[in-house]
Amino acid sequence: MAQDSTIKPFLEVLSGRRQAVPPIWMMRQAGRYLPEYRELRAKAGGFLDLCFTPEFAAEVTLQPIRRFAFDAAIIFSDILVIPYALGRSVRFEVGEGPRLDPLDTPDMAATLSREADMTKLEPVFEALRRVRRELDSKTALIGFCGAPWTVATYMVAGRGTPDQAPARMMAYRHPEAFAKIIDVLVENSVRYLLGQLKAGADVLQIFDTWAGVLPPREFARWSIEPTRRIVEGVRKIVPDAKIIGFPRGAGALLPSYIEATGVDAVSIDWAAEPSLVREKVQSRVAVQGNLDPLALIAGGAALDRAVDDVLANFAGGRLIFNLGHGIQPETPIPHVEQMIRRVRGSGLRE
């Protein structure tokens, strides 16, 4: 029997139905490895200009869908748009990444606005509406935000650091002041995600890129609990909202994360222990991941083996095939095509 053309395989997995061929997309799939992205990026000027010009953001979002026919598009934006909407200075320096005015003392934290100006994020919502109109009926649309812990690490330090020590130190020395930053980010992340659902997103992902630097007690307080509050806040308004969590580097704490947060799926990095994930995680929620981005750069037989390992480990349950983190700019496009062929041919090998 032919598959219903209106069914989105990505949403089927999140709704509890394993797919013989796992749906596939990539974190950072709209990015510098694509020549069409680089061309539009140069035309846009600054990175935030690219994010906040709906015509450009929508086009960049759609580029990898046109080229690779992924099962999901993720809106082109950045996790630091909420600090921007809170009135913080956010800049992207070429070759250096984001720069913000640091909130590294209790007095500085006290200057943080409580409520984000959502009109500043209207370009993101408009880009979502444009993409929604262009996607076919089988392709899901993902909206996202950064988890409060990860966003706070950039806000406190004013930049990315190797281990985000400034935020960790502030959380130890001034937990009340740090908690106020987290509270503001929780409240405004809920508002932002609800706006994305209203604009056409099918699914939401919460990126906690720096979760893995936290010890277990702090992980529970600063990663799990804020994420739980966001999920609860979104579902209070949209009870059936589908939400994916990505606590990168959580490792053995993944079972605690899914139990407490209530996410529908969890994205895992390439170092996650397969047996733990199968037994303690995938038995309860869908799993997304977890190809090493360097295997994708390597290509050839090494890439085939790495893809097959992910499928062998997780395709027996509910799996969304993805990378364990974002695709690297130097990744050859033929290697992406090789990965997709390997994954989509897996149903024939069952």
UniProtKB/Swiss-Prot annotation:
CDD domains given in the database record: URO-D
Alphabetical GO biological process terms: protoporphyrinogen IX biosynthetic process from glutamate
Location within or outside the cell: Cytoplasm
Residues annotated as site: Transition state stabilizer: 78
InterPro entries registered for this protein in UniProt: UROD/MetE-like_sf, Uroporphyrinogen_deCO2ase_HemE, Uroporphyrinogen_deCOase
Name of the molecule in the record: Uroporphyrinogen decarboxylase
Quaternary organization: Homodimer.
PANTHER family on file: METHYLTETRAHYDROFOLATE:HOMOCYSTEINE METHYLTRANSFERASE RELATED, UROPORPHYRINOGEN DECARBOXYLASE
